[in-house]
A protein has these predicted regions:
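Non-heme Fe(II)/2-oxoglutarate
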Residues: 1-81, 113, 131-137
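Catalytic core of non-heme Fe(II) oxygenases with the double-stranded beta-helix
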Residues: 70-203
Length: 203
């Protein structure tokens, strides 16, 4: 996980928010709503920044303006999870650009990697069957509200995983991680109705 400071300036963030103020979402399934980032806006605000970041790049799917009403639990955005026919030889990265900020907006990224939901399920199963002396405890759930992400008991899956980092959403910054890395959102719903961000998946 890598945090990029000064990726956008605050005025650019305001322009993006204003652009989508009365915009209808093309996909709305209740938990979240998506729409593709307008191409003119992308060219104006993001293209050169991505060139600076990667020299050259290929986007797997369009950049997405996303509004989340509920936090995402532990998952990956791997290419094979989105499309089982895809190769994992070049997994690519995800770039998250927050359009809101606050102490309750956090993305937690772990070092463990999974290609699909089945591998995540197996990882949890292996964890449940571990002897007590093999269970790790990073105490991340004491710092970030992750109670929704996995049932809390005597042992906690979120605490057992190897922490890569916690990204507190801050306007103007961005964060990058490998697409097959496990990650989750903190529970912001006790304090906010929703949160907005731009997410882009790269080859």
């Amino acid at each position: 996980m890598k945090i990029i400071e000064n990726f956008l300036d605050v005025n650019e963030v305001k322009q993006i928010k204003e652009h989508y103020k009365n915009h209808s979402f093309t996909c709305n399934i209740g938990d979240y709503a998506n729409t593709e980032v307008d191409q003119k806006l992308f060219n104006k605000m993001l293209h050169e920044k991505f060139i600076t970041l990667f020299d050259s790049y290929k986007i797997t799917q369009a950049s997405i303006y996303q509004r989340c009403y509920l936090p995402f639990g532990i998952h990956t955005d791997s290419k094979t999870r989105m499309d089982p026919t895809r190769s994992v030889d070049t997994e690519g990265v995800a770039v998250l650009i927050p359009l809101d900020e606050g102490e309750h907006f956090n993305t937690v990224v772990w070092k463990e990697k999974c290609a699909n939901n089945e591998e995540i399920t197996q990882l949890i199963t292996d964890f449940v069957n571990l002897p007590n002396d093999k269970v790790q405890n990073s105490n991340i759930t004491e710092e970030v509200d992750l109670d929704f992400a996995w049932e809390k008991g005597e042992r906690n899956f979120c605490n057992h995983l190897t922490l890569d980092g916690v990204y507190n959403w801050k306007l103007g910054t961005a964060v990058i991680w490998e697409r097959n890395q496990l990650h989750a959102s903190s529970d912001f719903t006790k304090h906010h109705k929703y949160k907005d961000a731009i997410t882009t998946f790269f080859e």
